[in-house]
Amino acid sequence: MGENMEREMLRPKTIAMDQNSASARSNPEREIKTGRLEPASNSAPTMAIDLQAVTMIYRDKTVVDSLSFGVRAGECFGLLGPNGAGKSTITRMLLGMATPSAGKISVLGLPVPGKARLARASIGVVSQFDNLDMEFTVRENLLVFGRYFQMSTRAIEKLIPSLLEFAQLEAKADVRVSDLSGGMKRRLTLARALVNDPQLLILDEPTTGLDPPARHQIWERLRSLLIRGKTILLTTHMMDEAERMCDRLCVLEGGRMIAEGPPLSLIEDIIGCPVIEVYGGNPDELSLIVRPHVDRIETSGETLFCYTVNSDQVRAKLREFPSLRLLERPANLEDVFLRLTGREMEK
């Protein structure tokens, strides 16, 4: 998502702000199996996002193909797929920036694109790139962004301290954005998306280009938002990010859903055993040697993926090839994608 789309979607009507509105909306919290706190509910969970048989055709090309999924209020739902899978197109349709060729979309209980502007008043967006005003200070960026929502200067200034605390940028309030590190800029971009106290956050590749410590800081901030009852739609091509953050996810390929469910369930149901990666030999020749001792074999480039619970037998068979490198690890979402498509995900 680029700057033009982000600025276009920031045309909502006046929003009544209340710093306590998130907690006011939340019910008592309960512990769930993931260890995350989520709002409890005595009724069926409401759907923050609902797509029904949505198709998008652009220049005679089907970009999104009869896609259906729902995102429950209070969960983190992932759209996982390579570039060109349809993630950005789905996001544009959710924001009312593109009209589907067929199907129905509902966001926060409102039909989109019909009432997209009203829905956007309760949505925060973090685009893939930091669309910050580099010559402004951290504080000034938050102040200017709040005015897109027709908030008064007084209301924004009252909110800024809590946003700075959330982004862990209290000491950088009067520093120009151009002087911040990449991780600080991403935290500021995330805090900026909270100015209007949104119910739903749409995050497009939120940690792309960050080093591991900065990525973990962003993930920690996102978890705190989920505890507060926010709903997150996360688009990513990073398997570890999807596995760590998402309660459920939809795996996309060519605009089609090829799998949907909780990450660990997908891994268990589709893979179900550890993996040994074998490097440094001819995959075709090696596969003939180990095939009797594995459940399944996949090949990608020069790497042989052996899916097996009999790792000792596989290692024993490969000892006569001292130049080989072996990596034994638990299965992950990369293996799921490789199994479903026959190739590794393109970054």
From Swiss-Prot:
Source domain of life: Bacteria
Subunit structure: The complex is composed of two ATP-binding proteins (NodI) and two transmembrane proteins (NodJ).
Class of this enzyme: translocase
Biased composition (Polar residues): 17-26
Protein name per UniProt: Nod factor export ATP-binding protein I
Biological role: Part of the ABC transporter complex NodIJ involved in the export of the nodulation factors (Nod factors), the bacterial signal molecules that induce symbiosis and subsequent nodulation induction. Nod factors are LCO (lipo-chitin oligosaccharide), a modified beta-1,4-linked N-acetylglucosamine oligosaccharide. This subunit is responsible for energy coupling to the transport system.
SUPFAM superfamilies found in the cross-reference section: P-loop containing nucleoside triphosphate hydrolases
EC number per UniProt: 7.6.2.-
Extent of Basic and acidic residues compositional bias: 1-11
Region (Disordered) residue spans: 1-32
Topology in the lipid bilayer: Peripheral membrane protein
Matching Gene3D superfamilies: P-loop containing nucleotide triphosphate hydrolases (3.40.50.300)
Keyword Translocase carried by entry: yes
Gene from which the chain derives: nodI
Source species of the chain: Neorhizobium galegae (Rhizobium galegae)
Any GO MF annotation of the entry: transmembrane transporter activity
Record flagged with keyword Cell membrane: yes
CDD domains from the UniProt entry: ABC_subfamily_A
Similarity annotation: Belongs to the ABC transporter superfamily. Lipooligosaccharide exporter (TC 3.A.1.102) family.
